[in-house]
Amino acid sequence: MINLRKTHPLMKIINHSFIDLPAPSNISAWWNFGSLLGICLMIQILTGLFLAMHYTSDTLTAFSSVAHICRDVNYGWLIRNLHANGASMFFMCLFLHVGRGIYYGSYLYKETWNIGVILLLTVMATAFVGYVLPWGQMSFWGATVITNLLSAIPYIGTTLAEWIWGGFSVDKATLTRFFAFHFILPFIITALVIVHLLFLHETGSNNPSGINPDSDKIPFHPYYTIKDTLGLMILLLVLLSLAYSLSDLLGDPDNFSPANPLSTPPHIKPEWYFLFAYAILRSIPNKLGGVLALLASILILLIIPLLHTANQRSMMFRPISQTLFWILTANLITLTWIGGQPVEQPFIIIGQLASMSYFLLIMVLMPLAGLFENYMLEPEW
């Protein structure tokens, strides 16, 4: 009998990607996050589709349509809670996935890494426009503050901001187009994910040792399907715990009030997963400088492969680089905390120091550590 999964044109692609895929035998739980991100994307698209069936993208009815979903639609409260907290889980997995890539030198697969950075930017754009849709106070003011940053661009800034708004401020036209963007972007993300996987399967997965694993590979199924299922169970446990019991833990209380252009909240801040970049933006007193620093904080990921100086790929056997990596992690947590604090001392100076440390660590200290570790490994020692 012909094995259909190995001969059918469509099944063959799935088979080579998820079933008979040769995978390194030593990849750890840090390699689970790719599949978890795929699951998160599916959850977000499904819950988002059901929310879009009941949501209206009009400034007069957007807020009440979200209230209607939570009160009158069957399990609408659950769908909304899963979607809102699913975004947090998505970003948690994303940050861990990127961190794994930096720690184990996965960025040396340059095509996969670059598509991954584009994916990160696209997911951030999707989350931003999605945050505006409930049309609460923080939704409105967050959209106003962030889109207004475009006006810092010389010559074309003001025109560009008004073009994005569809008027002279954030209003009905802005909400309608943001809903359109929020609906289409996840499908663009799905296409990019396929390209990401395509490039990954050209080279095969990296592994914790950073050594070529071709001599010791095992089939993806059943070994890693079982392993990924454990990760999925933990993800669902956390997501459902948030959605059922702590649904408003990661949200902003200001979003319980409808958007009011005449009343500014005392402290405008985005969702927690943007706070590190927001802190970097605020740490520079100049508007254009802040916007450039904000962009640089994400786009710096693109030059990480160029800053790799070590002879070893992974940080597994490089204690100095490991130490700097965990300092960078602590630094990002500090930036996230600062982004949620009011603009006053001592938070201003802490934010400025943490922002400076962020760029210093990635661009100077980590490449120098790689060179020093090479020197320490030379035979005369």
Curated annotation (Swiss-Prot):
Membrane topology according to the record: Multi-pass membrane protein
Transmembrane segments: 33-53, 77-98, 113-133, 178-198, 226-246, 288-308, 320-340, 347-367
Binding of heme b b566, residues: 97, 196
GO cellular component: mitochondrial inner membrane; respiratory chain complex III
Subcellular location(s) per record: Mitochondrion inner membrane
UniProt entry keywords in alphabetical sequence: Electron transport, Heme, Iron, Membrane, Metal-binding, Mitochondrion, Mitochondrion inner membrane, Respiratory chain, Transmembrane, Transmembrane helix, Transport, Ubiquinone
One BP annotation, GO: mitochondrial electron transport, ubiquinol to cytochrome c
Binding site for a ubiquinone: 201
GO molecular function: metal ion binding; ubiquinol-cytochrome-c reductase activity
Requisite cofactors: heme b
Cofactor note: Binds 2 heme b groups non-covalently.
The keyword Ion transport is annotated on this UniProt entry: no
Stored InterPro entries: Cyt_b/b6_C, Cyt_b/b6_C_sf, Cyt_b/b6_N, Cytb/b6-like_sf, Cytochrome_b, Cytochrome_b_C_euk/bac, Cytochrome_b_N_euk/bac, Di-haem_cyt_TM
Residues annotated to bind heme b b562: 83, 182
Primary role: Component of the ubiquinol-cytochrome c reductase complex (complex III or cytochrome b-c1 complex) that is part of the mitochondrial respiratory chain. The b-c1 complex mediates electron transfer from ubiquinol to cytochrome c. Contributes to the generation of a proton gradient across the mitochondrial membrane that is then used for ATP synthesis.
Additional comment: Heme 1 (or BL or b562) is low-potential and absorbs at about 562 nm, and heme 2 (or BH or b566) is high-potential and absorbs at about 566 nm.
PANTHER family: CYTOCHROME B (PTHR19271:SF16)
Family from the record: Belongs to the cytochrome b family.
Subunit and interaction comment: The cytochrome bc1 complex contains 11 subunits: 3 respiratory subunits (MT-CYB, CYC1 and UQCRFS1), 2 core proteins (UQCRC1 and UQCRC2) and 6 low-molecular weight proteins (UQCRH/QCR6, UQCRB/QCR7, UQCRQ/QCR8, UQCR10/QCR9, UQCR11/QCR10 and a cleavage product of UQCRFS1). This cytochrome bc1 complex then forms a dimer.
Protein name per the record: Cytochrome b
Native species: Sminthopsis longicaudata (Long-tailed dunnart)
